[in-house]
Curated annotation (Swiss-Prot):
It comes from Streptococcus pyogenes serotype M4 (strain MGAS10750). This is Phosphopentomutase. InterPro entries: Alkaline_phosphatase_core_sf, DeoB, Metalloenzyme, Phosphopentomutase_DeoB_cap_sf. It holds the Pfam family Metalloenzyme. The gene is deoB. Mn(2+) 2 binds at D298, H303, H351. GO terms for biological process: 2-deoxyribose 1-phosphate catabolic process; 5-phosphoribose 1-diphosphate biosynthetic process; metabolic compound salvage; nucleotide metabolic process. Pathway: Carbohydrate degradation; 2-deoxy-D-ribose 1-phosphate degradation; D-glyceraldehyde 3-phosphate and acetaldehyde from 2-deoxy-alpha-D-ribose 1-phosphate: step 1/2. Belongs to the phosphopentomutase family. It is an enzyme of class 5 (isomerase). Transmembrane segments: none annotated. Isomerase that catalyzes the conversion of deoxy-ribose 1-phosphate (dRib-1-P) and ribose 1-phosphate (Rib-1-P) to deoxy-ribose 5-phosphate (dRib-5-P) and ribose 5-phosphate (Rib-5-P), respectively. It catalyses: 2-deoxy-alpha-D-ribose 1-phosphate = 2-deoxy-D-ribose 5-phosphate; alpha-D-ribose 1-phosphate = D-ribose 5-phosphate.
Length: 403
C-alpha cells in the first residue's frame, strides 16, 4: 500500500542553492561556476521574501552561509535538504532525466556561438532555403522574430537559433513558409543531430504570424525530442498502471515516454500553477504522480541576468504555494525542487552548476527536519518506493525519513 496516494513534483527551473562540489569543471564566459549561488545571491542582492517556502524549511537547508533574507524555522512544516547532480551536464534535459533516475555520462551539446556551418549548409541544401546567419546564436524566441521576421518575409530565409539548452529552433512565418514545410525541415534537422558533433535534445518548430512590429507565435509549435536512453521511473510507473501527469514542458523533456496524461504547455508560471491546480482537482486523479516544470525563472530572468525579476518570480510562486497546498489531499506529498542553477548575478548567460533544494510537505506529516543530503535521482527512488515499482539506474529513497 502506498504511503502517499498522490505525489506532486514541482520543478522551479534553475532555482539552485549554491555551487556544487564539481562546479570548477563548468564555466560561464570563461569563469568557473565555483562561486555561483542562485538563491543566495538573489537573497543577498535583491532581497527575497518567500514565507511559505520558509515555513516548510527552505532557510534550514545546510549552507556555508545562511540565506540572508530567509529565516530558519524552529518548527518547520516539512522536510528539506539539498541534492547534488552526478550527470555530466547542467542543462534542463540532463537535470530532469537524472531526477527521474538516469545517469547521463555523455552530455548533450550546446552551441553558445551558434551552430557550425556543416549543420547550416545541410539544412539549406535539404530545404532549398538560405539561413539568416546573424540569427544563428542563443536568442530569445520573441526577440529573434522581431529582429529577423521582416527580413524573412522579404526573402523566405530560415531563422535558425538556439538557447542555453541543447536545442535547435527554426522560426518561420506561416504565410511565408507553410507549417507542413517547416515540420519537414525540422524532421530533417532532427535526423542530423542525433550524434556528435551536434547531439541535441530537441529540435523545435516555431511558427509565427503577424506583421513587423506585431508578430505572435502560434500554437503550431512542434518539438522533435529524443526519448531517454533507458527507462526512467516515469516508465516504471506507467507500466505498473500508475497514472503520470505532465504539466509544462515535462512531456517534451521526456518525449512523452512514461507520460500517461499530458496537461499541456505553460504560457507562464502562473498559467502552469493554474494547470497544476486543475490537475489536482481532477476527479479521476485519485492515485498517481504529477510532474510540473515552471520555466519562467530560467527563461525570463536567469539567462537575462535579472536578479530583481527573478526575485519577483519567486515571490509570485511563493504567494501561490498555499493555493497548491489547499488543493492537495491529506495523503498527498508535495516535492519542490529545481533542475540546475542559473545565478542571475553571475558571469555569462549560461546555467550554473549548483546543488538543488528539496522541500517536502504533506498534511499527514507528524514530524519535520532535514533529509540526508543526496543526489537528484533520490527523488525518483522515493517516488518509486512509494508506488512499489523499481528504481531506474540510480537513486536512494528518502521515503523512510518522511514521518
Amino acid at each position: 500500500m502506498s504511503k502517499f496516494n498522490r505525489i506532486h513534483l514541482v520543478v522551479l527551473d534553475s532555482v539552485g542553492i549554491g555551487a556544487a562540489p564539481d562546479a570548477d569543471k563548468f564555466f560561464n564566459a570563461g569563469v568557473a561556476d565555483t562561486d555561483s549561488d542562485t538563491l543566495g545571491h538573489i537573497s543577498e542582492t535583491a532581497g527575497l521574501s518567500v514565507p511559505n517556502m520558509a515555513k516548510i524549511g527552505l532557510g534550514n537547508i545546510s549552507r556555508p552561509i545562511p540565506l540572508k533574507t530567509i529565516p530558519t524555522e524552529d518548527n518547520p512544516t516539512g522536510y528539506v535538504t539539498k541534492l547534488e547532480e552526478v550527470s555530466l551536464g547542467k542543462d534542463t534535459m540532463t537535470g530532469h532525466w537524472e531526477i527521474m533516475g538516469l545517469n547521463i555520462t555523455e552530455p548533450f551539446d550546446t552551441f553558445w556561438n551558434g551552430f557550425p556551418e556543416e549543420i547550416l549548409t545541410k539544412i539549406e541544401e535539404f530545404s532549398g532555403r538560405k539561413i539568416i546567419r546573424e540569427a544563428n546564436k542563443p536568442y530569445s524566441g520573441t526577440a529573434v522574430i522581431d529582429d529577423f521576421g521582416p527580413r524573412q518575409m522579404e526573402t523566405g530565409e530560415l531563422i535558425v537559433y538556439t538557447s542555453a539548452d541543447p536545442v535547435l529552433q527554426i522560426a518561420a512565418h506561416e504565410d511565408i513558409i507553410p507549417v507542413e514545410e517547416l515540420y519537414k525541415i525540422c524532421e530533417y534537422a532532427r535526423s542530423i543531430t542525433l550524434e556528435r558533433p551536434a547531439l541535441l535534445g530537441r529540435i523545435i518548430a516555431r511558427p509565427y504570424v503577424g506583421e513587423p512590429g506585431n508578430f505572435t507565435r502560434t500554437a503550431n509549435r512542434h518539438d522533435y525530442a529524443v526519448s531517454p536512453f533507458q527507462d526512467t521511473v516515469l516508465n516504471k510507473l506507467a507500466d505498473a498502471g500508475v497514472p503520470t501527469y505532465a504539466v509544462g514542458k515535462i512531456n517534451d523533456i521526456f518525449n512523452g515516454s512514461g507520460i500517461t496524461n499530458d496537461m499541456g504547455h505553460n504560457k507562464s508560471n502562473s498559467h502552469g500553477i493554474d494547470t497544476l491546480i486543475k490537475t489536482l482537482q481532477l476527479p479521476e486523479f485519485t492515485k498517481g504522480f504529477s510532474f510540473t516544470n515552471l520555466v519562467d525563472f530560467d527563461a525570463n530572468f536567469g539567462h537575462r541576468r535579472d536578479p530583481e525579476g527573478y526575485r519577483d518570480c519567486l515571490h509570485e510562486f511563493d504567494n501561490r504555494l498555499p493555493e497548491i497546498i489547499a488543493n492537495m489531499k491529506e495523503d498527498d506529498l508535495l516535492l519542490i525542487t529545481a533542475d540546475h542553477g542559473n545565478d542571475p548575478t553571475y558571469a555569462g548567460t549560461d546555467h550554473t552548476r549548483e546543488y538543488i533544494p528539496l522541500l517536502a510537505y504533506s498534511a499527514s506529516f507528524t514530524g519535520n527536519g532535514l533529509i540526508p543530503q543526496g543526489h537528484f535521482a533520490d527523488i525518483s527512488a522515493t517516488v518509486a518506493e512509494n508506488f512499489g515499482v523499481d528504481t531506474a539506474m540510480i537513486g536512494e529513497s528518502f521515503l523512510g525519513h518522511l514521518k
